[in-house]
Amino acid sequence: MSRFMTKRLPVRHDTVAPDGADVRELLRVERGNMAHFELAPGQISVAEAHHTVDEIWYFVRGRGEMWRKLGDQEEVVPVDPGVCITIPVGTHFQWRSFGYEPLAAIGVDMPPWPGGGEAYSVDGKWEPTVESGPG
């Protein structure tokens, strides 16, 4: 049996993230996993933070903003295709989509996403327009 894996981006989302974004699961290995996250045009995510998972996101479609806060450091950055950001464990974050197309990013979780209870809701920068999912 091969240890190599290959997968095409699913047409439909697999689940809804705790922040309310659609999630298309990609691949998972022992020390990390990758997924595609998408917010519909004009949507604002639920603000959240993670107990144990660091993330790196690379935006591939749309435009919007990402808010991050960790301790006394806080910032809002514009995001669009080509922008890459980190979300260290414990960071409060929220994102929103502008324009006429979805805002989408490829995200890497380290360690792999453990499932329910990893994400927890926090006070955000904006009023969310989506509902939290199970993750």
Question: What is each stretch, according to the model?
Answer:
Residues 1-36, 46-47, 117-135:
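A short, N-terminal "cap"/entry segment at the start of jelly-roll beta-barrel domains
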Residues 21, 32-34, 44, 54, ...:
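Intrinsic-disorder/low-complexity, polar/charged segments enriched in Ser/Thr/Lys/Arg/Asp/Glu/Gln
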Residues 24-28, 37, 45-51, 68, ...:
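Short histidine-centered beta-strand/loop micro-motifs
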Residues 36, 66-68, 105, 115:
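Short hydrophobic/aromatic-rich beta-strand segments that constitute the beta-sheet cores
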Residues 38-40, 51-66:
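Short, conserved beta-strand element in jelly-roll/cupin
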